[in-house]
């Protein structure tokens, strides 16, 4: 499951849809203040993923987060305040991934709802990556753990 809060750039949203489909995500939840998924640039940049991957626009991502946690879904927030690197987390069970606005990240409330806050370690003077790039890194770590670690073990 992918949660997207207040994504504003149509190209980012389109890339997030394509990446989510390629990584086997089964549903995307969008906050109401996310760019229109049917805007021409989003539709073009999804390369059709918009029409194959189930998604919904949610009024209240926070209550949805609480319901998922009650259903024993691990909820991971990508947040600069995270204390654990994304590759140190276990994505073996049911998981939801929270990604926030390009400039401001996740709201404090949604970030605090997460089971665990993660970060992508950075070298040099870079503080963060583009939201679509970050999602790609984390989703493919989940794919690696689920597919390849099981096969090796």
Could you tell me what each predicted segment is?
Residues 1-153:
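Post-transcriptional modification and biogenesis factors for structured RNAs
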């Amino acid at each position: 499951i992918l949660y997207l809060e207040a994504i504003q750039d149509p190209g980012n949203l389109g890339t997030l849809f394509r990446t989510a489909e390629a990584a086997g995500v089964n549903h995307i939840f969008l906050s109401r203040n996310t760019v229109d998924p049917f805007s021409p640039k989003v539709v073009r940049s999804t390369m059709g993923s918009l029409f194959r991957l189930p998604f919904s626009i949610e009024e209240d991502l926070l209550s949805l987060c609480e319901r998922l946690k009650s259903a024993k879904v691990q909820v991971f927030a990508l947040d600069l305040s995270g204390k654990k690197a994304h590759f140190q987390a276990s994505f073996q069970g049911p998981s939801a991934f929270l990604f926030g606005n390009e400039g401001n990240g996740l709201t404090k409330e949604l970030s605090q709802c997460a089971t665990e806050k993660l970060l992508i370690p950075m070298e040099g003077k870079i503080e963060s990556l583009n939201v679509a790039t970050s999602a790609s890194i984390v989703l493919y770590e989940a794919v690696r753990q689920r597919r390849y670690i099981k096969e090796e073990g």
